[in-house]
Amino acid sequence: MAKTANKINIRKVKRKTPKAIIHVQASFNNTIVTVTDVQGQVISSCSAGACGFKGAKKNTPFAAQTAAENAIRLLIDQGLKQAEVMISGPGRGRDTALRAIRNSGITLSLVRDVTPLPHNGCRRPKTRRV
C-alpha cells in the first residue's frame, strides 16, 4: 500500500507594497514582465507565453501589452502607487509594455534601459542567408 504524501499548503502573504520595480525583458521570441519589491523579492510575473500566446505570436506588441497588464493587475488592487521600470532586450514589445504600464495609473518615478551592451566581447553569430 502506497503512503500518501503530506501536502503542505503554502499561501502567499498579501503585502501592501506602495513602491515596486517592474522588470521588462523583451527578447526576439518572448516578453517577460516581472514585478519585484525594493529588496528584489518577486511579487508577480507574467510572460506572453503564460498569457496564451504560442509560437511567433509571443513576440508581438499586443502579447507584450497583455503580459504587462496581467502582471500589474493584482498589484494595483493591493495599493501599488509608485514604480520604477527597468527595460532590457531588443524585442518588439518594449515600447508597448511600457505604454501599458504607463496607462495603468501607476506613477513612474524612473524608466531605465538596462540592456547589456558588449564592449567587443564574444564573436557575433554569422549572418543568415535565406
Curated annotation (Swiss-Prot):
Part of the 30S ribosomal subunit. Its main location: plastid. Keywords: Chloroplast, Plastid, Ribonucleoprotein, Ribosomal protein, RNA-binding, rRNA-binding. PROSITE patterns: RIBOSOMAL_S11 (PS00054). Belongs to the universal ribosomal protein uS11 family. It is found in: Plastid, Chloroplast. GO terms for cellular component: chloroplast; ribonucleoprotein complex; ribosome. This is Small ribosomal subunit protein uS11c. The keyword DNA repair does not apply. Gene3D superfamilies: Ribosomal protein S11. One of its GO terms (biological process) is translation. GO terms for molecular function: rRNA binding; structural constituent of ribosome. HAMAP family: Ribosomal_uS11.
